[in-house]
Amino acid sequence: MKAANCLYKYIWLAMTLFPLANVGLFICNGNFTFTVYGWYFILQQLAICMVVALAEELFFRGLLIREMVFGFEIRPMIASVVVSIAFGVMHLLNVNSYATWNYAILQSICAFAVSINLSAIFIKSKSLLWCVAVHGLINMTSVGLEFNNERFVLGNIEYVIFLLVSFIYLIYGVKMLNDDVMEGR
């Protein structure tokens, strides 16, 4: 029960920080054009976000972290960093589809930090449910930000916001990995 209480103590940040940053930038940008796409498109994008989150979490947390930490008994911090580097590098591939190099690098840094956090959540809970929920929520708000406004361009302040949020995620994930629940590992 102590592990569950400790997990819930931390989960609120993972569930809210990046989505709130995305929604805040979305609102500050001032263009609410959901009607341009229609509800079918919006629901389709939300479903895609959840399927992508599920697939990535099954691979990175459900397979890699599970095998490294619980199978090969690699220290959680080392396993989390290795998997998070791979997760961040994978997001660099977005430069081939829609992103500029600056945005792809920013997204990779954010993905690394979020991955540390998601890895800690998975190690503590031994469940992918929270990881998929957090990842899906981040994906949904990110896609909403990208699709809602074709004029949306990240300026210096947006880069600083995303880097600050990434830093908070990173620190929070490291704290979870080093928390008293992890001492037995």
Name the predicted role of every residue range.
Residues G88-V95, N117, L170:
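Transmembrane alpha-helical segments that form the membrane-embedded catalytic/substrate-channel core
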Residues M1-A53, V143-R185:
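Specific transmembrane helices
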Residues A55-V82, A120-S127:
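Membrane-interface helix/loop boundary segments of multi-pass membrane proteins
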Residues C49, P76-L92:
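Small-polar-interrupted transmembrane alpha-helices in polytopic inner-membrane proteins
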Residues C49-A55, G88, Q107-F112:
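Residue-level hotspots within the lipid-embedded alpha helices of multi-pass solute transporters
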Residues F18-P19, S84-F87, G136-N139:
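Residue-level recognition of pore/gate-forming positions within transmembrane alpha-helices
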Residues Y103-V160:
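Functionally important transmembrane alpha-helices
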